[in-house]
Amino acid sequence: MRIATWNVNSVKQRVPRLLPWLDQRAPDVVCLQELKLTEDVFGELLGSELEARGYEWAALGEKSWNGVAILSRVGLTDVTPGLEGGPGFPHQEARALAATCGGVRVHSLYVPNGRVPDSDHYAYKLEWLARLREVVAAGPADAVVCGDMNIAPADADVFDPAAYVGHTHVTAPERDALNALLACGLRDVVRDRWPDERVFTYWDYRAGMFHKDCGMRIDLILASEPVAKRVEAAWVDRQARKGTGPSDHAPVIVDLDTAPDGDIGPMVPPPSARPSRGRTKLPQAKIVDRG
């Protein structure tokens, strides 16, 4: 079973890339984030195309912001929209969707950005993550928790850790919250597979960050131990970040039981740019966006 997660940063803008990508990579389960439209519009836009490809789907959206979806060719049952008992800002946002797919409880997540440390939104992010941990801990043994976590797990997951000092995504409380989630019995399967490699999933649109390979690894697939033992490949589909009109995030793909493309990775294709040796000015878009 192939499971993928992708922050598409507006599904309406990404349709010309999403559908060919589904045909090329043939994932069995896809978690999407940042739909930026309602579930009704999602269905009007993609419903027939997905059904023609054998996908059932569920979405939770809101106009212009946030939004998550799960597409599945291996069953889609027990759909739970929203983070049960989770906090709002001020109301619950379209950030979490769970369903059972092929016997695995799958969570598609768009974790709050946090915006600025010590802000109300930052506190909301930490409270949201604490509630997520409770939900996952109470869930079934076979689980995948994935999406845009808006946290780089370690300094190795940031192109220039010094550039992010004082910003969200890398603070100790955020990483502690992520580690508490992992302590529920989850494994960071990409990092497990590639413990010493430079791996990113997000590159700011500006300042040539993608071509310089100045990115962050904030899109994660976390798997419970029974599922993690089935992993045969785990990689970032960097090809989907190239070309015209991409999302600023690349899909992350995990293959269970069999690996159709072999044990490839960590980023496919690998970047041609050498790691930046000097300080690179940090674009602000990811830090101050509404997410």
Where are the predicted features?
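Conserved beta strand-loop-helix elements of the APE1-like EEP
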Residues: 63-79, 197, 209-230, 256-257
